[in-house]
């Protein structure tokens, strides 16, 4: 790990995204577009599936570093609350969100996806630097999510969503910073 990312500071400041001051009950007063709904549903799925990605990651050599393990504990917690906040927003705007949506999506995994997950875990035990693949993928995911939140926040006409998304983006920026600095 480089000195550019202070894991202790990250651990001390890690918390769920604060949405207590957002008036979700008034979100329905301002509609969202079909494109925003599609995008938010996808984002909610990504955030909700963090646990599935973590499950695969825990089978690999990527977790041999104690700083990585410390980060992952906080990361999965923060990502869960991102998905929850998006779900709360969507439900407040009148969209019904299936509570078992993540499970249903997970059950549609193909044999190939399952094989790749286990194969990667085995490769990680043989190739010393294979963990860098996971960290690179993590950095890409965090950066694209960060950018998507920022773009959607600029475009939406819904003031509640416009307030929520930068809060999520702030966490994604910290997550990206961790992965980026880990790869240096």
Enumerate the predicted regions with their spans.
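Non-heme di-metal
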Residues: 1-184
């Amino acid at each position: 790990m480089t000195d550019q990312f202070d894991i202790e500071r990250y651990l001390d400041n890690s918390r769920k995204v604060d949405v207590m001051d957002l008036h979700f009950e008034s979100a329905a007063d301002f509609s969202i577009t079909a494109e925003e709904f599609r995008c938010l549903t996808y984002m909610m799925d990504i955030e909700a599936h963090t646990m599935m990605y973590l499950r695969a990651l825990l089978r690999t050599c990527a977790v041999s570093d104690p700083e990585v393990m410390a980060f992952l504990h906080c990361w999965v917690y923060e990502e869960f609350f991102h998905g929850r906040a998006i779900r709360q927003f969507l439900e407040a705007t009148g969209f019904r969100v299936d509570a078992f949506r993540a499970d249903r999506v997970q059950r549609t995994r193909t044999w190939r996806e399952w094989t790749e997950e286990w194969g990667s875990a085995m490769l990680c035990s043989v190739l010393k630097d294979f963990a860098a693949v996971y960290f690179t993928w993590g950095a890409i995911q965090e950066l694209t999510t960060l950018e998507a939140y920022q773009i959607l926040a600029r475009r939406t006409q819904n003031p509640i969503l416009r307030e929520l998304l930068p809060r999520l983006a702030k966490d994604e920026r910290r997550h990206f910073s961790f992965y980026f600095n880990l790869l240096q």
